[in-house]
Amino acid sequence: MKAIKSILFLLVAALFVNVAMAETPKKGAKKAVTLAVDTKASKINWLAKKVTGQHEGTINLASGSLVANGMKVTGGEFVIDMKSIVCTDITDAEYNKKFIGHITTGDFFEVEKYPTSTFKITKVEGANITGDLTLHGVTKSVTFPAKVSMVGGKATATASIPVDRTDFGVKYGSKKFFDSIGDKAIDDVFNLNINLVAGK
């Protein structure tokens, strides 16, 4: 009988030890932290090309956050203010206003109807980031390489993201849809060059 009691005692003791070990965080384990994007310090530059040249400019982040676990970024969400589009290469004020008016209305991004675009990170593998980009009311998964640095609770990230506008229903001037457009064609793909700064 004493032997049975001893065995039961050992089993119960072992059970409590295992439960305690399971509930105790592993030494060195990292907790995920959310870093707020500094929208003033962060920059997004865009570049769009056509047969006869190209245009470039900036667009602002409205808000954003990065999720970091130790030295690695594991998630994040960002909101882009589509009404903040600026063209920096057209110096003539009247032509610049006309150009911005064109790309923000019906033929292109319809910013009154779609005032923001969003990007949500869904996967991070090595240097590659995958996420859901919502633009012009359409959501598509995109993958791109990024360089991320974590120093003293602050994160910086740079990336160049090619975006095919026709995937998001923006078809104006695309040879894919208008075969006879000739030298008035506008490239389907434009680039977003991103520099992010985020901290606690």
Q: What would you call each of these model-derived segments?
A:
Residues 21-200:
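Low-complexity, acidic/polar, glycine-enriched regions of mature
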